[in-house]
UniProtKB/Swiss-Prot annotation:
The keyword Repeat does not apply. SUPFAM superfamilies: L28p-like. Transmembrane segments: none annotated. One of its GO terms (cellular component) is cytosolic large ribosomal subunit. InterPro entries: Ribosomal_bL28, Ribosomal_bL28/bL31-like_sf, Ribosomal_bL28_bact-type, Ribosomal_bL28_sf. This is Large ribosomal subunit protein bL28. One of its GO terms (molecular function) is structural constituent of ribosome. HAMAP family: Ribosomal_bL28 (MF_00373). It comes from the Bacteria. It holds the Pfam family Ribosomal_L28. GO terms for biological process: translation. NCBIfam families: L28. Keywords: Ribonucleoprotein, Ribosomal protein. It comes from Xylella fastidiosa (strain Temecula1 / ATCC 700964).
């Protein structure tokens, strides 16, 4: 399973570890992903999503119905 947020599209980024001597080695920055389930009252069911903490805040702000409508419009199967 890929490390991608279903709502925001956040994914793994790459960069460098930089030591005190300024040596650089490659590293990955992983998104803060969680499998969360949200109650959708209009459909009377739970929906499981793999979301970042940023996406959880977005869902709290806009509502799960609006977020699901956006996902379905973009072709995501939910």
């Amino acid at each position: 399973m890929s490390r991608v947020c279903q709502v925001t599209g956040k994914r793994v980024q790459t960069g460098n570890n930089v030591s005190h001597a300024n040596n650089k080695t490659r590293r990955r920055f992983l998104p803060n992903l969680h499998k969360r389930r949200f109650w959708v009252a209009s459909e009377n069911r739970w929906v499981k999503l793999r979301v970042s903490t940023c996406a959880v805040r977005t869902i709290d702000k806009n509502g799960i119905d609006a977020v699901l409508a956006e996902l379905r419009a973009s072709g995501e199967k939910v």
